[in-house]
Amino acid sequence: MSLLHQARFFITVNHLRDLPATAVPEVAFAGRSNAGKSTAINILCNQKRLAFSSRTPGRTQHINYFSVAPVKAPDPLAFLVDLPGYGYAEVSGSAKYHWQGLLSDYVQTRQQLAGLILMMDARRPFTDLDCQMVEWFLPTGRPIHVLLTKADKLTNSENAKALRETRKMLQGYAEQLETPVPMTAQLFSSLKRRGIEEAQAVIAGWLNLPEARKAEREPAAANSVPPAVPPASDPAA
């Protein structure tokens, strides 16, 4: 079982000064208000109401932290960070300004941030605001993994095209950097439970969770060559 299943609500933050003063790694989830971010977090953590999604898109304008640790552990091993959804037109100007500042400052300056899970609707990936989020985060030199959500809404050929074009866009961004940074993408569907294990593996690896370390050891053990068995001695010799 993934340790992500043990995630628990930790704190809500509305200003950078209130971010937890911890040294453990964090993985942030970002995306448009209607990209299915909260639903995906719940599915990845095998919980129904860990991350709440407002009935009115754009209402969530703060940062929610979820701790990841075994049930009886005294301290978190890591955090999942649910960032405010962006791009909803009915948010007031002052709220939108605060919201955008909180998002950009967090993703650009948070030293504990190990990677960004960027959620995009598979039917319309890389909107202008999605590109803005990538451009904010790119200079940090940390990895980005795109979840193309709502893949169940598309045909197989449409999904293949969306994934191919998304990877091409990410490659273009990666080529802007002097030092290569992992920028990956996958299809994801909360409804069809598609892509869950793949996404969990990425997150666990970034957070250095025990399950990721175990997965690294298992292929090495499977591919190791057993020691040669010496030939039996001939009793008649």
Swiss-Prot record:
- PROSITE patterns for this protein: G_ENGB
A single Gene Ontology biological process assigned to it is: division septum assembly
Could you tell me which InterPro entries the record lists for this protein? G_ENGB_dom, GTP-bd, GTP-bd_ribosome_bio_YsxC, P-loop_NTPase
Binding positions for Mg(2+) per the UniProt entry:
S38, T60
- Per the database record, which ranges form the EngB-type G domain? 23-209
Q: Which Pfam families match?
A: MMR_HSR1
Q: Where does GTP bind?
A: 31-38, 58-62, 82-85, 149-152, 187-190
**What keywords sit in the KW lines?**
Cell cycle, Cell division, GTP-binding, Magnesium, Metal-binding, Nucleotide-binding, Septation
Q: Which family does it belong to?
A: Belongs to the TRAFAC class TrmE-Era-EngA-EngB-Septin-like GTPase superfamily. EngB GTPase family.
What protein does this entry describe? Probable GTP-binding protein EngB
Q: Which gene encodes it?
A: engB
